[in-house]
Design a protein with these regions (language model features):
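Active-site nucleophile elbow and catalytic-triad environment of alpha/beta-hydrolase enzymes
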Residues: 34, 68-84
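Short alpha-helix in the alpha/beta-hydrolase fold that links the catalytic acid
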Residues: 90, 104-112
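Conserved alpha/beta-hydrolase "acid-adjacent" motif
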Residues: 101-107, 131-132
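Alpha/beta-hydrolase fold nucleophile elbow
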Residues: 2-8
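Surface beta-strand/loop "capping" patches
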Residues: 135, 142-181
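Hydrolase active-site cap/lid region
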Residues: 16-65, 122-125, 130-138
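Short beta-strand/loop motif that positions the catalytic acidic residue
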Residues: 88, 94-96, 100
Length: 189
C-alpha cells in the first residue's frame, strides 16, 4: 500500500493516480484546487475580470480558449480528476493556500460536495502557490501517521450558508480550532 502527495502538477498526478491504482491507501493533493476545471476557471476569470498573471503562459498559448471545444472535452474525459470523483474512496487531505496565485480560495465549491468521504480540507493562511514553510507538510505527516497507525482522525462537519460558517464536532474528542478570516469583499487579498 502507498500514500501519495504532491503539489501543483504533482498534486494533479496524486488525484489521477488515486483514481486508478488500488494500492493507494490515502493521498494529499496540494495547491491544485481546480477539480471540475471548466467551472473553476470560469469562476477564476469572472472573479478577476481577467486571467491571473500566474496563468499567463497558458493564455499565451491559447489554452484557455480551448475550453468548450470538443477536443478539450475529450481531453478532460481522460485527464480531469473530477471525471473520476466517485473513485476517490481513500482518505484524502486536500491542502490549498488562501492567496494561491493560480486558484481562488473558494474553488472547493465546484467539487467538494461530490467528493466521497473520508475527506479533509485545509487552507493555509497567507499561503501562496508555493506554501512556504512547513505548515502544510506537518499536517500531511500527521494525516499519514494517523492512517498507517489506524488512529481516528477528528471528524468535523461544516457548512457555509447565508454567510455563516457552521461546524459540528464530536464532543467526546479534544480539539484545537484556530480561526483565520479575511473580511474584504474584494478578491485581491
Amino acid at each position: 500500500k502507498f500514500f501519495i502527495a504532491g503539489a501543483s502538477k504533482r498534486g494533479w498526478t496524486a488525484w489521477t493516480t488515486a483514481a486508478v491504482d488500488n494500492r493507494i491507501m490515502g493521498f494529499s493533493p496540494v495547491v491544485i484546487d481546480v477539480l471540475n476545471t471548466v467551472p473553476s476557471f470560469q469562476h477564476h476569470y469572472k472573479s478577476y475580470g481577467a486571467w491571473s498573471p500566474a496563468v499567463q503562459d497558458y493564455v499565451d498559448f491559447d489554452i484557455m480558449d480551448w475550453m468548450g471545444t470538443k477536443e478539450f472535452e475529450k481531453l478532460l474525459d481522460i485527464v480531469e480528476p473530477y471525471e473520476f470523483i466517485k473513485l476517490y474512496k481513500q482518505p484524502k487531505l486536500v491542502i490549498n493556500g488562501t492567496i494561491d496565485e493560480f486558484f481562488l480560495p473558494d474553488s472547493w465549491k465546484f467539487y467538494w460536495k461530490d467528493l466521497p468521504e473520508e475527506k479533509y480540507l485545509q487552507y493555509v493562511p497567507n499561503g501562496n502557490h508555493g506554501l512556504k514553510g512547513s505548515y502544510a507538510t506537518r499536517n500531511i505527516f500527521s494525516f499519514y501517521y494517523h492512517l498507517i497507525n489506524d488512529l481516528p482522525i477528528p471528524k468535523l462537519e461544516w457548512e457555509i450558508a447565508d454567510k455563516f460558517f457552521e461546524i459540528n464536532l464530536n464532543p467526546n474528542l479534544d480539539y484545537e480550532i484556530n480561526l483565520w478570516k479575511a473580511n474584504s469583499s474584494k478578491r485581491d487579498f
